[in-house]
């Protein structure tokens, strides 16, 4: 799994500053991101963040943000588990 790019982190941050963990729709998100990104880029990043688990799709074009700390925990857990296994193998 690749880590997030700067653009994706910035989009998450801008949405977080505006909505925190409240529900929002695509139009509201696009309005928030309009000064910085095109509609195409904004939609692409929102879909990607949704796929990765940083944005929950609530159906009917409604979304909510997932706490970044929770995302880091879920992402790093698998990484740390894998590193631990590899480290044990190399240490013999």
Describe each PLM feature range.
Residues 50-60:
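A short, conserved structural fragment
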Residues 1, 7, 26, 65, ...:
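Contiguous, function-dense segments enriched for cysteine-driven chemistry
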Residues 70-92:
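Short, amphipathic alpha-helical interaction segments positioned at domain boundaries
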Residues 20-33:
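Short acidic, hydrophobic short linear motifs in intrinsically disordered regions
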Residues 1-21, 77-78:
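Short alpha-helical segments that sit at the start of domains
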Residues 58-64, 68-69:
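Short, Lys/Arg-rich nucleic-acid/phosphate-binding segment
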Residues 36-51:
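Short amphipathic alpha-helical interaction segments
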């Amino acid at each position: 799994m690749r880590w997030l790019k700067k653009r994706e982190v910035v989009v998450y941050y801008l949405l977080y500053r505006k909505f925190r963990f409240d529900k929002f729709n695509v139009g509201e998100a696009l309005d928030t991101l309009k000064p910085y990104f095109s509609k195409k880029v904004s939609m692409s990043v929102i879909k990607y963040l949704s796929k990765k688990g940083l944005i929950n799709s609530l159906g009917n074009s409604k979304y909510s943000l997932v706490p970044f700390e929770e995302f880091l925990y879920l992402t790093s857990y698998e990484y740390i588990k894998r590193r631990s296994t590899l480290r044990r193998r190399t240490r013999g």
